[in-house]
Design a protein with these regions (language model features):
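Short beta-strand/loop motif that positions the catalytic acidic residue
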Residues: 374, 379-382
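Core-facing hydrophobic residues within beta-strands of well-ordered domains
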Residues: 182, 401-404
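Gly/Pro-rich cap/lid or specificity-loop segments adjacent to the active site
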Residues: 8-242, 348, 365, 369-370, ...
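A structural signal for short secondary-structure junctions
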Residues: 371-375, 388-389, 398-400
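Conserved alpha/beta-hydrolase "acid-adjacent" motif
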Residues: 264-267, 386-393
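Short, Lys/Arg-enriched N-terminal segments with co-localized hydrophobic residues
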Residues: 1-6
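Alpha/beta-hydrolase fold active-site neighborhood
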Residues: 237-363
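Short alpha-helix in the alpha/beta-hydrolase fold that links the catalytic acid
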Residues: 271-273, 390-399
Length: 438
């Protein structure tokens, strides 16, 4: 059954059902620039999932990892796997963060909101400087202000947050800027460092990925030779994706992203075991490369999520150790590099904007005094060997939050919220509510 209605001017709602779920969709206007009352308006989209027996339960907002990825699309109570556990105590809001999904997505040929950029109907038509300026409005600070408008629209004083990866960064910004609106804060693999020293964070992640690479080669010794064959092909311009697109050495190195996932070693082993001339290999390689045209925000302003009052200046490239630079079998993880924007035809449109954004002076995201004063209960899953968000930085930041309880575990990789089924969320809800000690 579907019912539709209008909740206020320019705001739309629709309610429908899935087996075991009641689904309400909400769309409302939000300013592109929250500091400008005359700013162009984006559309903000969210789906609210409820157990049919619990349509009055408090809200839990899921903040997706990324940046640049939309919220999951549920097809039932177990999709994603943790949803059923959340619905026992909450209604769950799946928020498409601005620029993703149905929230005025960023793309070269997507129609821009009226008045967003003078003289341009799409970002492809805009100058690189205009593209860059537009994209400065898609960080966690703006996402939090969007969420606050949604909260006010729904008429609730407080709600709880569940932040996965970059969603945890956004949750921390929420506690810094609007802690009074937060009932409970849950983090999974997503507590960032504070301050401008991005290079040290990336240096740590490079060292971690080098160690993961060596562990993989030790477990599957033949894989290193297969990787060297691929490196030789890449250097010769003979490594290609299904459409004929060339893959260079640095882009190839990013298949190391697999090593930060559950069963990632096995996935990498299977990929390297394929005949490099086969269609299967070309397609699977394309699927394993982390940065691409589907979610351009993830590539173009990725490093800005770590920028707490600094310029990024290609921090991951600058922090790459010499030993890694000299050995292409030491793989990369979530490390953006310039060649992405020349090799990938879908990212070429963003190349000049990416250079400009790398020199943009990003404002601070976090206020340490506000975090120390945040009287909000919470719990965090900190993964001991997290490939993307180093544990030591997460723990230092967590120590600022007076009511946050941390659970350090080596049982899961960065995506433990999903791979654990209901396990990680169940643990955090109990920890935050005082139903367990650790």
């Amino acid at each position: 059954m579907i019912t539709e209605g209008t909740m206020s001017t320019d705001t739309r709602s629709r309610t429908w059902t899935l087996p075991g779920l009641e689904v309400t969709e909400v769309t409302l206007p939000v300013p592109l620039d929250h500091e400008d009352d005359t700013s162009a308006r984006l559309e903000l989209f969210a789906r609210i999932y409820a157990d049919p027996e619990g349509t009055d339960r408090p809200y839990l907002v899921y903040l997706q990892g990324g940046p640049g990825s939309e919220a999951p699309r549920s097809v039932g109570p177990d999709s994603p796997p943790w949803l059923a556990r959340a619905l026992r105590e909450h209604r769950v809001i799946m928020l498409d963060q601005r620029g993703t999904g149905r929230s005025t997505p960023v793309g070269p040929d997507v129609a821009l909101p009226e008045g967003a950029i003078d003289g341009a109907a799409t970002l492809r038509e805009a100058t690189p400087a205009q593209q860059a300026q537009y994209l400065t409005h898609f960080r966690a600070d703006a996402i939090v202000r969007d969420a606050e408008l949604l909260r006010e629209h729904l008429g609730v004083d407080t709600w709880s947050l569940l932040g996965q990866s970059f969603g945890g960064f956004t949750t921390l910004r929420y506690l810094s800027a609007a802690a009074a609106s937060v009932e409970t804060a849950l983090f999974t693999g997503g507590i960032p460092s504070l301050g401008p020293d991005m290079e040290s964070v990336y240096r740590t992640t490079w060292e971690g990925m080098a160690a993961r690479s060596e562990r993989h080669w030790a477990r599957f010794p033949g894989d290193r030779d297969r990787m060297r064959v691929l490196v030789d092909r890449a250097e010769a311009g003979r490594l290609r994706l299904p459409g004929g697109q060339k893959v260079g050495v640095e882009r190839l190195r990013r298949i190391g992203m697999l090593l930060g996932r559950s069963q990632g070693q096995e996935q990498l082993h299977h990929l390297l075991g394929l005949d490099p001339d086969s269609p299967a290999f070309a397609h699977d390689l394309a699927g394993a490369l982390p940065f691409g045209g589907r979610n351009p925000i993830y590539a173009v302003i990725h490093e800005s999520c770590w920028a707490d009052g600094t310029v990024t200046d290609w921090a991951a490239e600058r922090a790459m150790p010499g030993t890694v630079r000299e050995d292409p079998t030491l793989l990369a993880g979530e490390h953006v590099h310039r060649e992405l924007f020349t090799e990938d035809p879908e990212l070429q449109v963003w190349a000049e904007a990416a250079e400009l954004l790398a020199q943009h002076p990003w404002p601070r995201l976090y206020d340490e005094d506000a975090l120390r004063a945040a009287d909000v209960p919470g719990a965090a899953a900190v993964y001991y060997d997290d490939a993307y968000v180093p544990r030591e930085y997460s723990m230092a930041t967590a120590a600022l939050l007076p009511r946050l309880r941390t659970w350090v575990t080596s049982e899961y990789e960065h995506g433990g919220l999903r791979s654990s089924g209901q396990g990680v969320l169940d643990h955090l809800l109990d920890l935050a509510k005082g139903r367990r000690e650790a």
